Amino acid sequence: MIKKYVEENEARMLEELFSLIRIPSVSAQPDHKEDMVRCAERWKELLLEAGVDKAEVMPSKGNPMVYAERIVDPNAKTVLVYGHYDVMPAEPFELWKTEPFEPVVKDGHIWARGADDDKGQSFIQAKAFEYINKHDLLKHNMKFIFEGEEEIGSSSLGPFIEEHKELLKCDVILVSDTSLIGADVPSITTGLRGLAYWQIEVTGPNRDLHSGTFGGAVANPANVLCKLIGDVTGPDGKIRFPGFYDDVEEASKEERELVASIPFDEDEYKKSLGIKNIFGEVGYSTIERTGYRPSFDVCGLWSGYQGEGAKTVIPSKAYAKISSRLVPHQDYKKIGQLVVDYFNKVAPDTVSVKVEMLHGGYGYVCPIDFPAYKAAERGFEAVFGKRPLPVRIGGSIPIISTFEKLLGTKSVLMGFGLESNAIHSPNENMPVDLWKKGIEAVVNFHLEYDKEA
């Protein structure tokens, strides 16, 4: 019955989703401020159409929040759905095969920025609610909170939660912003990595210099920066910041055995990424490296002349944006200062170095023995025909740990993305069939949760 409803309403549902995707709600770029408001307002309209009692766009210190609720019984359990309506920048535009903010369905996939992360996935939650509400199947209360700053650190949501604890009070938080192991291998995310993000600025001479007149006599900030960040990771994949691993907890033997049982084709992995070989911390599998171990990566690097042709200069400045994915028990503030101190200490006196931490967040581990998790297991099993595997993933949703800290509530991460969906990259996409299965699985979660509750 659920499947039939989704099939019959597919065209309408997709067009509703596309109305969200067409709004370029890029939180990282200030010139999209009006788009953030437009997207929040559109979410409000769609949630009201889906059947909530009330929906409102609420102010925060940054981009607005979208809050909605459907209260069937004040004494019943309450599920709070969290999602985000902001998206990553679409650049570089020239690498897209379609227009990033003009969604199309091609080869069975939705192609657009936000098709997966997180408009497509949040919309799964909204349409699942629409179904159970319309068919009088909702036996617990539902609340929704969608923010517009997840991709830039969720700095406004923590204070908003603190201010509106009673409004957001719930028994479990349901999130669709993660991935499956494979389209036919369901999984529930039981762990997220934390995050720390910095910008480094290296300054040398007071202006760009002629590379013939000054080359070999003056330190080149670009060369220095490359050396500084290149020295951070050793050939064994270890990160060399002193004290970086102090709070890293090793996975247990049982956890490592579970990870080893997860289907993973290394050759297919390399082929899908277009790489000849993998790299990472020696002694750990790829899945362990991305879910159980911390990482360090350059996210952006720029300096000097970047136009067409040649310009022989020693640049005055060089910049890098770097991130570190952290594991539970690592404190992003502690790591943040540790990295700042390290670069200031090792930088040569031929340049000056400025390291600024831009944002960060804590990791999260979800228990697998509480009622909502069991309901999610059965929700997946009803649609995919097999029990989902519990997995930790490499991404970060820092606000999840904040929810637990401020509301005392656990989260269940029912994600429906795939690695091949290219989130944060050109040609982001979402398989339509998997998207529809997601709606079915979330509907079944709610039905199973009522049995548990």
Q: Residue ranges of each PLM-predicted region?
A:
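N-terminal helical capping/dimerization or prosegment-like subdomains
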Residues: 1-93, 317, 334
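Acidic/histidine-rich catalytic neighborhood of metal-dependent amide-processing enzymes
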Residues: 110, 116-191, 453
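Flexible glycine/proline-rich, aromatic-decorated loop/lid segments
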Residues: 187-203, 417
